[in-house]
Amino acid sequence: MEKLKLGYLKEFCNRTMTCPKEIARIIEENEHKIRSCYSESFDISREDFVKMVLKDSTFIIELFLRADKKEKYKNDYLLSNPLLNRHILEDLILLENQLPFFILEELHEKFSKRHSENSLFIDLSRNYFYSCIKSIPKVMEKEKGKKKEVKHFTDLIRYFHCPTKHKDFGDSIRDLSTATQLYETGVIFKLDEVGGLLDIQFNKWYPTEICPCFTCSWLLNCLPCLKCFQCLERTQPLLKIPQFEIDDITEGLFRNIMAWEQCYYPSEAYLCNYMGLLDYLLDTGEDVELLVEKDIIVNSLGSNEAISKMVNRLCLEIVEENSCYSELAQKLNKHFDQCCNRNMGLLKSTYFSNLWRGIATIFGLIIFGFSLWSIIRPYVV
């Protein structure tokens, strides 16, 4: 790895037509500021510290510049090696490995800015992480060209996942039914293709609050083609969730971001709140399977059970002061606690789960009606 870093340092100097001493001078000027960004002191000399930051910072910037033009550098040793590229990504998101973001920005601004289509280092970083981390919402593409003050890459990736609009925080979630339990009470899980990862919404038509029989879920279950009529779909209790692709780096990524949030954003722990909500919804493999069927979860990890265990592990040592999903949880609990919703859900799943069962149920009711009429008719006429 050391040899690779030295090679990238040489390439960076060739690209920017500068020398390592000139880059080192900028780092020396900021040495005290860089050291102050770490909670622990470095017991190394000034010269060794500057060399370390020089190699790491130029390696990262050169990597991002090459990744931004993959076609040109498709034969690059690192970019053409998926396994090595994955290890580099894991190192970059590791909380204890972070370089202060400001020094990377300053070096890019002074030396490599003119050699990149992205004038801001944050945009260069966004392009790299967006291509590697599937959970970063596409909505973040709209944020290009905006400068944002971040401390390091873990903080930056958290920012990429955060909602574009501030969410209201309420009490922490104490109790919530699982995805399959909610589904049994008539809640329809739907993929939200527009919102960011954390933009989860529960919409329920007001008349169904008063009388659950006003829902058209049974009809839409039998005739899915009618879902194109918005007026019918609105009658269903809809839980809209954006897609979440889970792979083998997801656990490490979220563990680092959640640890960072617990220390520095305890009152705005968006990712901790999100994972806490999933911890309630995804209690078993069956819950995961339901969301996989709805295309809400893309399982690149393996078994559905592995995902539920991963989510449960991530939330083991998390302490929630509040939650941005407090109101959502209250609405879902209110829906679940109404016995009428459970009865309607049972009716739908038992008698109207598909077209043929729905037709059989209707014919059965018609025959039952005629039979009943034939019995009582002599006494009525």
List the model feature ranges, each with a label.
Residues I362-L372:
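Hydrophobic alpha-helical cores of multi-pass transmembrane domains in eukaryotic membrane proteins
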Residues L372-V381:
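Membrane-lumen (extracellular) interface motif
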